[in-house]
Design a protein with these regions (language model features):
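Short internal beta-strands
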Residues: 47-50, 170-177
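Short, flexible loop segments at boundaries between secondary-structure elements
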Residues: 173-187
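Extreme N-terminal starter segment of soluble prokaryotic enzymes
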Residues: 2-9
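Histidine-anchored nucleotide/phosphate-binding helix
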Residues: 35-39, 155-166
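Active-site alpha/beta core segments
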Residues: 34-145
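Short, well-ordered alpha-helix to beta-strand connector turns
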Residues: 6, 43, 104-105, 168, ...
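Short glycine-enriched, charge-decorated loop/helix-capping segments at active-site entrances
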Residues: 20-29, 122-126
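Short acidic-hydrophobic, aromatic-tinged amphipathic segments that line or gate anion-handling sites
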Residues: 200-207
C-alpha cells in the first residue's frame, strides 16, 4: 500500500489511564506504542486524540449515585455506558503514555471535555449533532484517507472509523496497532458495523 500526501494517521487516546495500571486500562494497551512508532514515519500527516474529561463528568459512574462502572443509562443523547473516573483534565492519567514519542503530530484533538456529553469518536461527540472540528480540519487540507490506531479498538477507534465513513472518507483500522476492551462482545459488534460501513481492516505490515 502506498501512503500519500492525502493520507493521515490518527492515533487515538494512547493515554496513561488506558494503559497498564490506569483507571480504565485496556488489556495489553501499551503494546500498540511500538507498532505506532514503526508506521508513523511513513505518514506526512498525523493527529493525536486525547480523552479530556472534567471532574464529575456525566460518563463517570461516580456522577450517578447508586450506579456502577460499566452499567448503561439513558442520557439526553441516548444510551451511555458508565465508566470509572478516567482521563481527568490535568491529571497524570490523562497524559499521553510516556513512551509515546510522536513530535511530528500536527494536531492534538481533545475530546470529552463537555461535562454533560461523552465523546468516543474523533469526529463527533456522542451527541452526533456536535462535531469536534476534525472533519473540517481534514477537508481544508484535502486529507481523504484516514488510518486509525490506538485505544480502544471497539470504542473510540471504532466510532472514529465509522464516522469517517459517514463523512465520505476512506477509513482503515490498523489491527495490530489497536487493542480492545471487548465488553459484552463489543469487538465483534463493532466489526459487524465496520463490514456494513466499508471500514477496511489491515495489519501494520500493509502500510
Amino acid at each position: 500500500m502506498q501512503i500519500t500526501a492525502q493520507d493521515v494517521l490518527v492515533v487515538i487516546d494512547v493515554q496513561n489511564d488506558f494503559c497498564s495500571g490506569g483507571a480504565l486500562a485496556v488489556a495489553d494497551g501499551d503494546a500498540v506504542i511500538e507498532v505506532i512508532h514503526r508506521i508513523a514515519p511513513k505518514f506526512e500527516h498525523m493527529i493525536l486524540t486525547q480523552d479530556w474529561h472534567p471532574a464529575g463528568h456525566s460518563s463517570f459512574a461516580s456522577a450517578h449515585p447508586g450506579k456502577k462502572p460499566f452499567e448503561q443509562i439513558e442520557l439526553s443523547y441516548g444510551a451511555q455506558t458508565l465508566w470509572p473516573d478516567h482521563c481527568i483534565q490535568g491529571s497524570k492519567g490523562a497524559e499521553f503514555h510516556p513512551a509515546l514519542r510522536l513530535p511530528q503530530a500536527e494536531l492534538i484533538l481533545r475530546k470529552g471535555y463537555r461535562l454533560q456529553i461523552d465523546s468516543y469518536s474523533a469526529f463527533f461527540e456522542n451527541d452526533p449533532t456536535i462535531p469536534t472540528g476534525l472533519a473540517g480540519y481534514l477537508e481544508e487540507r484535502k486529507l481523504t484517507r484516514v488510518f486509525l490506531a490506538g485505544l480502544a479498538y471497539d470504542y473510540c477507534v471504532g466510532y472514529s472509523a465509522l464516522d469517517a465513513r459517514r463523512l465520505g472518507l476512506q477509513a482503515y483500522v490498523i489491527l495490530d496497532a489497536c487493542r480492545a476492551i471487548d465488553m459484552e462482545s463489543s469487538a465483534s459488534k463493532i466489526e459487524a458495523e465496520f463490514d456494513r460501513a466499508g471500514v477496511i481492516l489491515i495489519e501494520s505490515e500493509a502500510v
